[in-house]
Amino acid sequence: MASFIEKLLATAIKSDRSYLILVSGQQGIGKTSFAIHATFTAYLNYAKVLRHLYFEADDFFKDTASMTKSLPVAVFDDAGVWLSRQRWYEKETVYLGNLLQLSRNLFKLVIFTTPSENLPKQIVTHLNYVIRALSVEERGNMTAGVIYKKSYTHAFENSYGRVEGVIRWPRRYPDDVYEAYSIIRSVKVAKFKAIAAVASGFKEEAKKAIEAVRESIDLERLRELIVKLGGDEDDIKVIEERVIATLKYFYS
């Protein structure tokens, strides 16, 4: 896996372009593991990996607004949830689709993970590679998949494009990374659940759920983990602000 990512990064830097990669497969098969290992290949720092892993468009927009140079990798995790094809008309999706046309000025590699492959056309048409995670091997320690090179500019139909080869990667990553990732993800999941509850007419229940998550989140522990993983003050600030902003969703 590392050689595939390293070659793409080298080509992207040399040719001043970017590559967009979709990683698909059933839940728990190792899509996020691919993204984390791939991003670590570029940054060699797990705190930087977590900083450049996005669960919603607003965090990405905030980061890229102040960027003055392109960075190696960004990850849109669980993209099928917050970038669903059914949301193609929403302004965040439209803006992101437009911004991805300028992705070479932002990130050299952009990785999307999703079980459903249900991304809007303005995202799909910019993809360069699709990696389908197919099986778990070696007693759950490795994931195997197939790399497809996109050869058309339409939404998913009957083919992913040309088969480039088979790829394998570790399904696990360090425990501290998993713990920090789980804290961040739990807050984002709570927000999406609350939004669904509000849309169904259960606003008070949604507030209570968010409050419960707020009380359970250990920000001090998250800070400790980011430092332990090699993060600097700016990494801590950015990641912590994302979590706090999400927890304040119903209190702004």
Regions found by a protein language model. Name each.
Residues Q26-Q27:
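The conserved Walker
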Residues Q122-R139:
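A short helix-turn-beta junction within AAA+ P-loop NTPase domains corresponding to the substrate/partner-engaging
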Residues M1-S15:
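Pre-Walker A adenine-sensing motif
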Residues F40-L53:
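Post-Walker A helix-loop "phosphate-sensing" segment adjacent to the P-loop in P-loop NTPases
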Residues Y129-I131, M142-S252:
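Conserved P-loop NTPase motor module
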Residues S15-L22:
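Pre-Walker A (Motif I) flank of P-loop NTPase domains
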